[in-house]
Amino acid sequence: NLHMELEGLQVPTDSQSSNETEPAYLTCNVRKYVPKSDATNGSDSVITYFLENLEYYEKRSNIYGYNDDAVRWTLLSRGVLEFLRTSRNWLPDVIVSSDWQTGFLCNYLRTTYKDDERLRRIATVFIIHNLYYQGMFDHRFVAEMDYDDGQSPMPSFFSPRILKINGMRRGITHADVITTVSPTYAQEIMTPEYGELLDGLLKER
């Protein structure tokens, strides 16, 4: 009961390598779902878009639990922004990101796309559901050389550094508005006891 459209999308990977195993772009499709009843009678309903990539999404049976999850979530964040940049039919006023997996989007929007005429006016809201999960690593045991301050440029999708990027910190750092699941949790995570080493940053924001 769905109407579907497909369009190709080239997502930059920021790869600096000439190695063919590290492509400069990943090709995705954007699938648009519109209920058939709404497509025919013109009623206003929620339209859903899905970013598709055979290697990083279609071949996987689960949402989480892969060694390259950081690449998969980075691709999603960058892919969403590339779709909005190249699609001339629709643009949101606000993008809502949730937890470390989409904190990269807030980062990209305020750095890579900060001067883009089409995207720079979009506001971002970052929702914290569980501050404990901050990336593909245990944030409590990070070597000094692997520490992510949230300000350095995002690495290439294929750089080993991508596995050490703190998506939670970057979402908090770059979002326009930060919110969480309850007023109580909002107060708790601004304390050393529950702040998971981000309480200082949260207080600053």
For the regions a protein language model found, what residue spans apply to each?
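Catalytic cores of nucleotide-sugar-dependent glycosyltransferases that transfer UDP/GDP/TDP-activated
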Residues: N1-R205
